[in-house]
Amino acid sequence: KSISLKPDYAEAYSNMGITFKDQGKLDEAIIASKKSTSLKPDHAEAYSNMGNILQNQGKLDEAIEAYKKSIMLDPNLANAHKNLSFALLNCGKYQEGFDEYEWRWKTDENLSKYRHFRQPEWNRETSLNGKTIFIWSEQGVGDTINWSSCLSYITTQAKHCILECQEKLVPLLKRSFPNVEVKAE
């Protein structure tokens, strides 16, 4: 209805794109998203939304470009950084992906999830050679499975790796990563 009242309402097209994406109508979602960015080329959130749609279509390179455009327009858009990290990590660009992933703590959904430990947090600049690293699940089961693909990157560097995850994933992850100590949350 918003678009019928104001055909040049870029935000409405961006929201329509999100709705189509959530309904699994990815072709319609990308059309709406592109309409939004054509109407308002400086709309950072629209480019971030477009990146999400492209990522759902499996078009990771295009998604990365959309997220980078979003970040260029609004360098503090935490969700764009977080989503860029997912695309980069899924492409195997671990260093850049992990750098962007730090932005997740600045997103609304993660502000209260940060856990504080006495041990120092690994900053990826410090060598893990001869050290133990503790990794904990901070998201759902699907994300834990997706992120487990990064364990091989970590285990090649650390002496010992401990993974805390959802109880139902313990048997699967123990079988998949016999060199990782897997514990239930």
Label the model's feature ranges.
Residues 1-185:
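Alpha-helical solenoid repeat scaffolds of the TPR/TPR-like class and their adjacent stem/linker regions
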